[in-house]
């Protein structure tokens, strides 16, 4: 997500976290000024700088997870996954709310592929985002980034959301 008048943030689930290791829930904001969380909070660098909070979260394939991001006032943003606090990050209090455009994505978080078989098969289903107790998007656009020539990755619309597939044997037919 982007914050009006500020920078970008992301919130999601990962298979291989660092501090803590293993499956995690993570919330990060570029340009964040402070962070507080039950397991890990601190600065990040590498692709810009900011603050991050993370918790161990044993998500399971096929289980629905509810991610909630809420403004708490005085520049603080709170992230929860399935009712559990991931943490809070403080940004410049002049930044506004969530910008009108948001992005949901899947990412292979690993070294570059040496062969297509290394991609593996993964599926993520995203429900339609809802803001401020019921505000829903007017529309959406699917985009698939270029892949290294490996077949089987696609994005498709579902009733109330989208499905991201990576490394499938073949894309669905018409």
Name these PLM-found stretches.
Residues 59-87:
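Carbohydrate-binding surfaces in secreted/extracellular proteins
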Residues 1-41, 54, 145-150, 162-174:
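Secretory/extracellular carbohydrate-interaction modules
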Residues 106, 111-174:
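Activation corresponds to long, low-complexity, non-globular regions
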Residues 42-66:
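Short, aromatic/His-centered strand-loop micro-motif at the edge of beta-sheets
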Residues 81-99:
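Short, solvent-exposed beta-strand-to-loop segments that form ligand-recognition rims
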Residues 33-40, 85-86, 109-119:
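Short, surface-exposed beta-strand/loop "edge" segments at domain boundaries and coil↔beta transitions
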Residues 25-29, 100-110:
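Short, hydrophobic/proline-enriched secondary-structure or compact coil segments at domain edges
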């Amino acid at each position: 997500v982007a914050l009006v008048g500020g920078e970008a943030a992301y919130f999601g689930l990962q298979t291989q976290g660092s501090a803590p290791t293993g499956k995690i829930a993570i919330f990060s904001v570029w340009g964040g000024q402070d962070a507080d969380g039950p397991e890990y909070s601190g600065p990040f660098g590498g692709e810009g700088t900011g603050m991050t909070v993370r918790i161990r979260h044993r998500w399971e394939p096929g289980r629905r997870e509810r991610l909630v991001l809420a403004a708490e006032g005085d520049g603080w943003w709170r992230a929860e996954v399935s009712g559990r606090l991931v943490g809070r990050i403080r940004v410049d209090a002049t930044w506004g709310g969530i910008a009108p455009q948001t992005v949901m994505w899947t990412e292979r978080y690993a070294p570059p592929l040496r062969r297509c078989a290394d991609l593996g098969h993964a599926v993520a289903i995203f429900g339609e985002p809802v803001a401020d107790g019921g505000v829903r998007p007017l529309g959406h656009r699917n985009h698939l980034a270029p892949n290294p020539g490996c077949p089987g990755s696609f994005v498709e619309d579902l009733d109330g959301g989208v499905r991201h597939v990576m490394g499938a044997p073949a894309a669905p037919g018409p």
